[in-house]
Amino acid sequence: MSPAPTLTPPLALDYLRELSADIRSGVVMDAKGKLLAGPKELGEAAHDLVRAAGEAEEIHVSLADGAVFAARSDKHALVVVCGRLALPSLIRYDLRLVLADLEGGTRPDAPAAA
C-alpha cells in the first residue's frame, strides 16, 4: 500500500470519471451527508441512500438501466451512478481508491489478477 495524495471533493469526482467511462454522475458528501461536490439533485437522493444503508461501508444497487455504487469512510461518502455495463468489482475498487486519496490515507492494494 502506498500513501495517497490528497484530493479536493471536485477533483475526486473528476478523477473517478477518468478511472471509469461507465460513471455517469456522482457526488461527494461529508460524514453528515452535506454535499461537497456534484449535482444538488443527485446529492439529496445519495444522502437518503447512504443514510438508509446504516453502517454499511459499501453499497451496490442494480437497476434495469444501470447501477448505483457508494463507499464511505468516517469523513466522506462517494456515490456514483453507472451504466449497466459497469463492472462492480472495479467500481468498488475505484471508489475505495478515491476515498483514500480524498482523505490522504493509504491506498488499497490492487485487486489480484485472475
Predicted feature locations:
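Non-catalytic interaction/Regulatory regions outside core domains
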Residues: 1-114
